[in-house]
């Protein structure tokens, strides 16, 4: 029972009554409680972690931009210089929330990515849900990689189009589905870096296949921005396919270290999304500060070649060390900042993650049902600020905990 002294902050009898009401609120329906119990029994119950000072091998902050004092200060200076001192957007962008910094940021993003237009969304989730629920129409077909992110799947579920998943990065399976559906508007959906495996598709051949069947290619670049390409522009530009890919989803909470997302495409696509993407229309926009941070992070990305190279060096060092320590068979093949070691079983992978954390390394276990049963894993996220010594040490510990030597 909660002790009385914990309610001392309530000053009035009305407040006390409200506190007691909250205290006595109805429990969850039994069906929901049972679902939580099943998760607990399966060692799969998700819980919010506490902040730690462990060595970071868990976050998506690949370039360390989230803690960049330069980005922080430059954002503040931009807002002051442009008289953008509001704390919030005040409304949706179609009403009162379309502040001038939005146009500046979208123009810069489009230019950086060599796209005709960019439209900012509040998050990568909102961007994917908005796109896939609005663009593919009844009678259209969506073909999506079986490992596509949950936000893509949720958007597809809201669409009136039919959808089929294809085997991961399997061009033959894509062509089989394309041949079965002639004379149909088809969208082929993939990711430039898959969030759980860290691998990439053969985008050149996929685009060739799409052009052969007049299909539209959509690429989620969430984990590629800041990581792949000469200036961190992503996979599509690195293979010079920006003019043939129909749409790109860029998210800013990873390599750019801030928040939000943008969909890149034609001016006509942007206009369509403004009119029909419900996750864009029916929500308060990002604050001017958030949008200015995006703009400043992009500016910083253009001059961040040193940290980008440091990240690439760390990825190479990680791959060298896992080979040296005979860990390669455990890992999904990846040349990105995401490196996943498959350790089947929720209990097993959680135990090894806990052991690494006790030794000072923040490595997260990815459990089923987030990944299929039998594909549970440790996911190592590499950063420009990790040292080679830290990488070697965490892999040596992994070898000890897995192999016992």
What would you call each of these model-derived segments?
Residues 131-150:
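Conserved PLP-anchoring active-site segment centered on the Schiff-base-forming lysine
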Residues 23-24, 67-69, 73, 111, ...:
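PLP-dependent enzyme catalytic core of the Aspartate aminotransferase-like
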Residues 26-87:
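N-terminal "arm"/small-domain region of PLP-dependent enzymes with the aminotransferase-like
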Residues 65, 310-316, 325-359, 382-384:
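Conserved PLP-binding catalytic core of the aspartate aminotransferase-like
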Residues 255-322, 329-331:
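PLP-dependent aminotransferase class I/II
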Residues 231, 237-272:
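Active-site PLP attachment segment
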Residues 164, 168-219:
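Active-site phosphate-binding strand-loop segment of PLP-dependent enzymes
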Residues 80-123, 315:
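Conserved N-terminal alpha-helix of the aminotransferase class I/II PLP-enzyme fold
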């Amino acid at each position: 029972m909660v002790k009385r002294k914990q309610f001392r902050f309530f000053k009035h009898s009305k407040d006390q009554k409200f506190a007691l009401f909250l205290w006595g609120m109805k429990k969850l329906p039994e069906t929901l409680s049972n679902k939580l119990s099943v998760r607990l029994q399966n060692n799969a119950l998700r819980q919010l972690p506490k902040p730690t000072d462990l060595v970071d091998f868990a976050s998506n902050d690949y370039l360390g931009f989230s803690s960049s004092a330069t980005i922080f200060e430059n954002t503040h200076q931009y807002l002051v210089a442009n008289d953008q001192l509001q704390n919030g957007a005040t409304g949706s962008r179609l009403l009162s929330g379309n502040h001038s910094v939005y146009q500046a940021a979208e123009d810069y993003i489009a230019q950086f990515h060599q796209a005709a237009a960019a439209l900012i969304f509040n998050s990568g989730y909102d961007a994917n849900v908005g796109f896939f629920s609005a663009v593919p129409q009844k009678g259209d077909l969506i073909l999506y990689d079986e490992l596509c992110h949950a936000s893509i799947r949720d958007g597809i579920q809201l669409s009136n189009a039919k959808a089929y998943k294809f085997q991961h990065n399997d061009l033959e399976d894509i062509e089989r589905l394309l041949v079965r559906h002639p004379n149909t508007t088809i969208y082929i959906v993939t990711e430039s870096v898959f969030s759980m495996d860290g691998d990439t598709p053969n985008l050149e051949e996929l685009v060739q296949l799409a052009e052969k069947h007049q299909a539209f290619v959509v690429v989620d670049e969430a984990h590629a921005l800041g990581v792949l390409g000469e200036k961190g522009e992503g996979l599509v530009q690195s293979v010079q396919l920006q003019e043939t890919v129909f749409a790109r989803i860029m998210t800013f909470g990873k390599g750019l270290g801030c928040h939000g997302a943008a969909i890149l495409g034609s001016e006509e696509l942007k206009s369509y999304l403004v009119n029909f993407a419900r996750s864009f229309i029916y929500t308060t926009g990002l604050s001017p500060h958030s949008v200015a941070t995006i703009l400043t992070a992009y500016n910083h990305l253009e001059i961040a070649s040193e940290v980008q190279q440091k990240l690439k060096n760390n990825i190479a060092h990680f791959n060298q060390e896992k080979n040296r320590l005979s860990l390669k068979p455990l890992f999904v093949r990846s040349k990105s900042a995401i490196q996943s070691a498959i350790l089947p079983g929720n209990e097993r992978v959680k135990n090894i993650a806990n052991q690494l954390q006790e030794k000072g390394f923040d490595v997260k276990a990815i459990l089923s049902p987030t990944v299929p049963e039998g594909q549970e894993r440790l996911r190592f996220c590499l950063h420009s600020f990790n040292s080679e010594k830290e990488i070697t040490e965490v892999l040596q510990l992994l070898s000890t905990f897995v192999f016992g030597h």
